[in-house]
C-alpha cells in the first residue's frame, strides 16, 4: 500500500515538472510504441461509425422516410455528441487519469453501437447517434494525450499525424464490408442495422487490447502519484525517475480556468493553438460537407451507376478514392521531418482547395471523369491537412492540461463537422451541387492562409510551460 506524504507544494510541483521535462526528451520503448498504436486505432472505430452510415443513408431513408432536416440530424448527431464527449472526456482524463477514461468510453461505445440495430424510428436513431458520439469524442481527446505522453519526441508527432491513415483504413474497411453485404442480396432494412451495429466488433477487440496498458507516467506525475509514475516510467522509457521521492504527494487538481491563461501566456503556444483550432474547423467541415456525401454525389452525378440502377460501380469508385486517401494518410507523417508541420498543412489545404474547385466545375458541366479526379485531389489534400491539427493542439499544451487541450481541439473538428453534415444538403438544394462545392472550397483556402501566416514551425517541439 502506497503512503502519501505532504511536502512543500511548490517543491513537489518543481519535482514533477523536472521529471516531466526529462521524460519528454526521452527515447521510448516498444511498450510506449504499442500504447501509441492502441490509442490511434480509435480512429478506425470512428471512421467505421461515421462512414458506414453514409453508405446506408439511402436505405434508412426508404425505411423511415425522414425529412431533409431529420436526415441531416441523423448524420450530424454523432458529431454533436463527439463535441460534448471531447470536452468532458478531456477534463475527466486530466483529473482522474487516462486509463479509467479510455476503458469506460470503449464499453459505452460497444453498448450504444449494438443498440443502433434495434431502433424503431428516425428519432430513436438520431438520439442514439448523439449518444454514441460522446464516447468517440472522449476517446479521441484522451487518446491524443496518451500518445503525447507515452512516446518519444518526433515519434509522438508522427503517431499523432497517422490519424488520417487510420481513418482511411476504417473507411475502406466499411466500404468493402457493406458492399459485400449488398452484393449478397441482404435485405436492405437488415443491412443498414447490421452495418451500424458492426462497429462494436473492432471496439471490443480494441478494449481487450487496452486492458493491459498502463497509465501514462506524466499523468501520474501531475496527480502526485510518484510511486506508480516511477514504475511506469521504467516500463515505457527505461528511466526510474530517481529525482522523485518514493512516496506519493498531494498536488492540486488542474483548474479548467487556468487552461487558456497558460496557453495565451506563451506566443508559440498561442499561435499554434489558434492554428490548430482553425485547421480542425476547416478540415472538419471540408470533409463532412463534401467527402462524407461523396457516395451520394457520385450516384446523383451518374458516376458508376449501371443502366439497371445498381450502385455497385459507385461503391467501387468510392473505395478506390479512399484507398488513395489512405496512402496519402500514410505518407503525411513521413513528410514531417522533411517539410515540417507548416509544409504538410499548406500542401494539404492547397490541394484540397484545387480539388474542390475542379470538382465544382466538373459537376457543373457533367464531366464525370473530372468529378472523380477532383475527388482524388481533394482526398489526397484532405488527408494531409487533417493530419496534424490534433497533434499540434496536444503537443504544445502542458501535461496537466493536455487532454483538455486535445478535447478543445477536437471540439472544433466536431462542431464544424456537425455544421457541414447538416448544412451541405440544404446548401445543395439552394445553390446546387456545384455551388455548394465552390462554397466548401472557401474553407480549404482559409486553412491554407492560416498555415501560411499563423502557424510557427513546431516539428521537434518540446513543451515547457511559461508562467502566465
What spans do the regions from the language model cover?
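Transmembrane-helix signature of 12-pass secondary carriers
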Residues: 2-468
Amino acid at each position: 500500500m502506497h503512503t502519501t506524504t505532504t511536502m512543500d507544494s511548490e517543491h513537489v510541483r518543481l519535482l514533477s515538472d523536472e521529471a516531466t521535462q526529462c521524460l519528454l526528451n526521452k527515447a521510448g520503448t516498444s511498450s510506449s510504441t504499442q500504447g501509441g498504436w492502441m490509442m490511434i486505432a480509435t480512429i478506425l472505430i470512428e471512421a467505421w461509425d461515421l462512414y458506414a452510415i453514409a453508405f446506408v443513408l439511402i436505405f434508412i431513408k426508404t425505411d423511415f422516410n425522414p425529412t431533409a432536416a431529420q436526415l441531416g440530424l441523423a448524420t450530424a448527431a454523432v458529431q454533436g455528441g463527439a463535441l460534448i464527449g471531447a470536452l468532458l472526456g478531456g477534463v475527466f482524463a486530466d483529473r482522474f487519469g487516462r486509463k479509467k477514461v479510455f476503458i469506460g468510453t470503449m464499453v459505452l461505445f460497444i453498448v450504444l453501437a449494438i443498440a443502433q440495430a434495434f431502433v424503431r424510428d428516425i428519432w430513436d436513431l438520431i438520439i442514439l447517434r448523439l449518444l454514441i458520439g460522446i464516447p468517440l469524442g472522449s476517446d479521441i481527446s484522451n487518446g491524443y494525450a496518451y500518445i503525447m505522453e507515452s512516446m518519444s519526441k518526433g515519434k509522438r508527432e508522427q503517431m499523432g499525424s497517422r490519424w488520417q491513415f487510420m481513418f482511411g483504413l476504417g473507411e475502406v474497411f466499411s466500404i468493402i464490408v457493406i458492399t459485400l453485404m449488398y452484393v449478397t442480396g441482404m435485405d436492405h432494412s437488415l443491412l443498414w442495422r447490421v452495418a451500424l451495429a458492426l462497429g462494436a466488433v473492432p471496439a471490443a477487440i480494441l478494449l481487450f487490447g487496452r486492458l493491459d496498458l498502463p497509465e501514462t507516467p506524466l499523468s501520474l506525475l501531475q496527480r502526485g502519484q510518484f510511486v506508480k509514475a516511477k514504475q511506469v516510467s521504467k516500463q515505457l522509457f527505461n528511466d526510474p525517475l530517481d529525482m522523485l521521492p518514493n512516496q506519493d504527494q498531494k498536488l492540486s487538481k488542474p483548474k479548467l480556468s487556468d487552461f487558456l491563461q497558460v496557453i495565451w501566456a506563451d506566443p508559440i503556444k498561442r499561435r499554434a493553438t489558434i492554428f490548430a483550432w482553425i485547421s480542425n474547423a476547416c478540415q472538419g467541415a471540408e470533409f463532412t460537407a463534401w467527402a462524407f456525401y461523396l457516395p451520394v454525389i457520385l450516384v446523383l452525378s451518374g458516376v458508376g451507376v449501371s443502366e439497371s440502377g445498381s450502385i455497385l460501380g459507385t461503391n467501387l469508385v468510392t473505395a478506390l478514392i479512399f484507398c488513395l486517401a489512405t496512402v496519402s494518410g500514410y505518407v503525411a507523417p513521413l513528410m514531417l521531418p522533411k517539410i515540417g508541420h507548416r509544409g504538410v498543412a499548406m500542401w494539404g489545404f492547397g490541394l484540397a482547395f484545387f480539388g474542390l474547385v475542379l470538382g465544382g466545375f466538373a459537376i457543373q458541366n457533367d464531366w464525370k471523369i473530372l468529378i472523380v479526379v477532383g475527388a482524388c485531389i481533394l482526398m489526397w489534400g484532405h488527408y494531409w491537412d487533417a493530419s496534424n491539427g490534433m497533434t499540434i493542439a496536444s503537443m504544445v499544451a502542458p501535461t496537466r492540461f493536455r487532454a483538455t487541450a486535445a478535447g478543445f481541439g477536437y471540439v472544433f473538428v466536431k462542431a464544424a463537422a456537425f455544421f457541414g453534415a447538416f448544412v451541405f444538403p440544404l446548401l445543395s438544394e439552394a445553390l446546387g451541387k456545384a455551388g455548394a462545392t465552390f462554397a466548401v472550397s472557401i474553407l480549404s483556402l482559409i486553412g491554407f492562409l492560416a498555415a501560411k501566416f499563423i502557424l510557427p514551425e513546431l516539428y521537434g517541439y518540446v513543451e515547457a510551460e511559461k508562467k502566465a
